[in-house]
Amino acid sequence: MNLLALTHPDLVFINPPHRTPEALIRWLAEPLAGRNIISDEETFIQSVLQRESEGPTALGEALAVPHGKSEAVQQAAFCLALFDDPIRWPGLDGDEEVRMVFLLAIPPAEAGSTHMQLLTTLTSLLTEDRVRERLLAARTREEAMSALSAEEPQKQDAPPDRSLLIPVILGSIATAAFLQAGLSWACAVG
């Protein structure tokens, strides 16, 4: 899945002013409405807050992926907020420190396809240390977009990174838990 097809530099924010989940979700919904990705900002916000109340969306690795499926969503897309200083976000074992927040907007018709593909692509990509480090080091929207493209090849002379095993395992666990939560939510809504 091409992540860049689902976002835009105008939907990427470095150190946004809001540091609580609800305030950040509300703030990130505004540019989605401005780009006509969502037709009704408040309906979309309520769908995200409802999903947040059903289960945590912090997935470890400094990542949170709040999301909403609503008739107000005109096309699948996401906003990205990056923080130098971590914010607190509800996780499976209490609040987690988060530095990357991907707010997903999913049309109901794509709840089982695009939604799951996007979650899997994001969590898989962000288990790669190189990608996560580039994203967290981004100082501009363009640098963040470049990190998401994952086009920068690794140096040929670099030895293989054996430290990837733990992030891959954690990413797989987080993906499985997130998919299970998403499927149970989709079944409950459907």
Question: Which stretches of residues belong to each language-model region?
Answer:
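Cytosolic covalent-transfer regions centered on His/Cys nucleophiles
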Residues: M1-G190
